[in-house]
């Protein structure tokens, strides 16, 4: 067991360590480092036991595998014998070869002679075959050219010319053929260059044309449901992807350009033009073999701009043809949408052309790379040259369509800002445009046999003409708009930029991406667009809106020009608006639309909005001052409206807040009439206290009703303008706060509006509302100032100590004038103001008149019974007039009438009346009544008696107040 353990130990050690010498060194080190003799003896014993065990295992293995071991030994012996035999045979072969060499050396001269003769005969046969083949070259060349297998034709022609000018140069019979083939070789590259240009500019765009035709068919199928443009602009925010070779190559050929030029092979069994990318590679390969690459590059450079112009011309005709087939007339309808359709088509085509050029340029670089000796001599163009020419052509196109040369007559109005002076056209400008419904014809001849055959014939003729020249003949050409020798799909004008700006900007971004321009550098087309908008378009827009606004604001009296009924109906307003306000609002709306159409210049348009609104605000302020200012002094109503305390008080009263809130939405108040009556009393108290007992001269009131009507129109107009501008600005600010996901669906690249501009716009809208409120306050106060103007002199200067006669039966002339003024103002206000504002002006007027008349009692020198009757008749006629205006009984004037009827009593009777009926008036009003009675009646005692009565009046009023308070406290306790 110990031996097996020792053997297992050493076997495991050997299996772990593949190096036996290392194991031996380890054992020796163990024996040498051990100081104990017994340990060394034990180690030695283990080694011996392991050795004996290994020897026994080896014997067992030999016994077990004896057959295999014997077979291996025999196989080894057989292999050794074969190797020995092979060595002997090789030695014999070497000896035989040496013998053959010696024999051949003896016959070398005869063999050399036979070999040379064989070569000569073979060469003669080759020349004869070559001559025979060359004679067939013209016929084969013609066949290859007809089938457009240009690479085979080029190889055949180059090879034939090289043979004719080389080995066969001395053959006289081939001189005519030599001249013919040489001439064809000199002209073949022109054919190849022409084919290359056809594929660069026509074939490359054919797929774009086909795609638009398919889209047109889809649009025509859905035309009955909702007619729309041929080019779908609903997804206009999606950037256009660059076209690659797969868009005009055959299916499955997307990796064609990944092949080198040398790897391109021509398949004689296929249509060579089926794969345009491969075909252009074949053309370049043929030109390279003709050594005409420099001429090819030169031709491409020289013809690039002209070919791009031809694409524009063909695309214009194509768009016109699409419109013609849809039944649209370009000469009747000015449709910038067709310009957008044209540009979208051109962008697709130019991208296709650029992709084709990139492929051709790659092939040219491959062809130059195979000729290192000429690499420095041949200077290729690059894609930057292509994009520069594309930008130049687009720039020329935009110059024409944007009318940068100002070919339109100066008298021709702008499409967007031409506000018609006639009412019907002016109203039509604001009317909602109804979608045009296609007119359904009653019957057609298109399904008749004659129509079908004629349509097929015409369609085939048009397709053939278009495939050859790329232009449509007849029909749509007559549909194009002529202009200075150029044909347009829509009328040239600066406003066309609004339709095409965003698509054009996206294409510019694609160009800059293709050119690898960083943010700091712009392409030429962007610079052109920026210069045009900043230096031309913005100034033109400003000139147009200035002309339109000045046309209605620079008149002698801009506040008298109102919009007509048609415009009011379209705008949905109930009262007339100033035409100047509508023009300004439409200008703001137009500028806001321009801000969205040309979002990159939103700040400029918003600044214009601020400037125009500020100018109109100044215009309105000037017109307002022209009405309310007389000899450098404001009329009283305007000065009161300007007073912060008075205006703040008036706006805090419930009748002002009720005016801004519909009646059904107002909060219900208990004893609302008493609440409003208290408000009227407060207003009357402030106005009477503010004026005092001064007489108002005629120049301090607005006597001309047309001025009041102008103020009313200004109020309605400015309030409408403030509401429209607030709505526009709030939608603008809301669009700036959208989430990015929402913003992508609402707006494209609309930069955030600065807080300063938004604040300015908000302040302007608020200033218009404030000005409108001030106009309404002036009207509200002016009616009341008229009452002061007529009623204060009635008491101060009127004679009411009259006897009963005919004169006493007449109304006071001042009351008649006041009634006349109130009626005139009512007529003007009812036509100019909305009903709730009209009510605001005249509600509470009876209370004020009542207060003025009651307060005027102190100014009468004396009053008789006839004077009291006349005064009551004055009050009655005023009450009757106000009732007709407000359509409610003016109970406050009953209060004034009862006050004067109270003067029928003597002073003592008046005191008893107060005791019996309670206190209806203020202590001061009772004092004025007692004082007037004391002045008017005889035998009422001296001043001492009068003072006693006044003292008694105070006591009565105090007693009545105490009784009233006690009753009130009792009610509270009961509750």
UniProtKB/Swiss-Prot annotation:
<dbReference type="GO" id="GO:0032991">
    <property type="term" value="C:protein-containing complex"/>
</dbReference>
<comment type="similarity">
    <text>Belongs to the SEC8 family.</text>
</comment>
<dbReference type="GO" id="GO:0030010">
    <property type="term" value="P:establishment of cell polarity"/>
</dbReference>
<dbReference type="InterPro" id="IPR039682">
    <property type="entry name" value="Sec8/EXOC4"/>
</dbReference>
<dbReference type="InterPro" id="IPR048630">
    <property type="entry name" value="Sec8_M"/>
</dbReference>
<dbReference type="GO" id="GO:0032584">
    <property type="term" value="C:growth cone membrane"/>
</dbReference>
<dbReference type="GO" id="GO:0071806">
    <property type="term" value="P:protein transmembrane transport"/>
</dbReference>
<dbReference type="GO" id="GO:0044877">
    <property type="term" value="F:protein-containing complex binding"/>
</dbReference>
<dbReference type="GO" id="GO:0008021">
    <property type="term" value="C:synaptic vesicle"/>
</dbReference>
<dbReference type="GO" id="GO:0035748">
    <property type="term" value="C:myelin sheath abaxonal region"/>
</dbReference>
<feature type="coiled-coil region">
    <location>
        <begin position="32"/>
        <end position="114"/>
    </location>
</feature>
<feature type="modified residue" description="Phosphothreonine">
    <location>
        <position position="238"/>
    </location>
</feature>
<dbReference type="GO" id="GO:0014069">
    <property type="term" value="C:postsynaptic density"/>
</dbReference>
<keyword id="KW-0963">Cytoplasm</keyword>
<dbReference type="Pfam" id="PF04048">
    <property type="entry name" value="Sec8_N"/>
</dbReference>
<dbReference type="GO" id="GO:0006893">
    <property type="term" value="P:Golgi to plasma membrane transport"/>
</dbReference>
<dbReference type="GO" id="GO:0030425">
    <property type="term" value="C:dendrite"/>
</dbReference>
<dbReference type="GO" id="GO:0006904">
    <property type="term" value="P:vesicle docking involved in exocytosis"/>
</dbReference>
<dbReference type="GO" id="GO:0030165">
    <property type="term" value="F:PDZ domain binding"/>
</dbReference>
<keyword id="KW-0653">Protein transport</keyword>
<dbReference type="GO" id="GO:0098685">
    <property type="term" value="C:Schaffer collateral - CA1 synapse"/>
</dbReference>
<dbReference type="GO" id="GO:0043198">
    <property type="term" value="C:dendritic shaft"/>
</dbReference>
<dbReference type="GO" id="GO:0005902">
    <property type="term" value="C:microvillus"/>
</dbReference>
<feature type="modified residue" description="N-acetylalanine">
    <location>
        <position position="2"/>
    </location>
</feature>
<keyword id="KW-0597">Phosphoprotein</keyword>
<dbReference type="GO" id="GO:0090522">
    <property type="term" value="P:vesicle tethering involved in exocytosis"/>
</dbReference>
<keyword id="KW-0206">Cytoskeleton</keyword>
<feature type="modified residue" description="N6-acetyllysine">
    <location>
        <position position="9"/>
    </location>
</feature>
<comment type="subunit">
    <text>The exocyst complex is composed of EXOC1, EXOC2, EXOC3, EXOC4, EXOC5, EXOC6, EXOC7 and EXOC8. Interacts with BIRC6/bruce. Interacts with MYRIP. Interacts with SH3BP1; required for the localization of both SH3BP1 and the exocyst to the leading edge of migrating cells. Interacts with SLC6A9.</text>
</comment>
<comment type="function">
    <text>Component of the exocyst complex involved in the docking of exocytic vesicles with fusion sites on the plasma membrane.</text>
</comment>
<dbReference type="GO" id="GO:0050850">
    <property type="term" value="P:positive regulation of calcium-mediated signaling"/>
</dbReference>
<dbReference type="GO" id="GO:0090543">
    <property type="term" value="C:Flemming body"/>
</dbReference>
<feature type="modified residue" description="Phosphoserine">
    <location>
        <position position="226"/>
    </location>
</feature>
<dbReference type="GO" id="GO:0005768">
    <property type="term" value="C:endosome"/>
</dbReference>
<dbReference type="Pfam" id="PF20652">
    <property type="entry name" value="Sec8_C"/>
</dbReference>
<feature type="modified residue" description="Phosphoserine">
    <location>
        <position position="32"/>
    </location>
</feature>
<keyword id="KW-0007">Acetylation</keyword>
<dbReference type="GO" id="GO:0007268">
    <property type="term" value="P:chemical synaptic transmission"/>
</dbReference>
<dbReference type="GO" id="GO:0043025">
    <property type="term" value="C:neuronal cell body"/>
</dbReference>
<dbReference type="GO" id="GO:0099092">
    <property type="term" value="C:postsynaptic density, intracellular component"/>
</dbReference>
<dbReference type="GO" id="GO:0045202">
    <property type="term" value="C:synapse"/>
</dbReference>
<dbReference type="GO" id="GO:0035255">
    <property type="term" value="F:ionotropic glutamate receptor binding"/>
</dbReference>
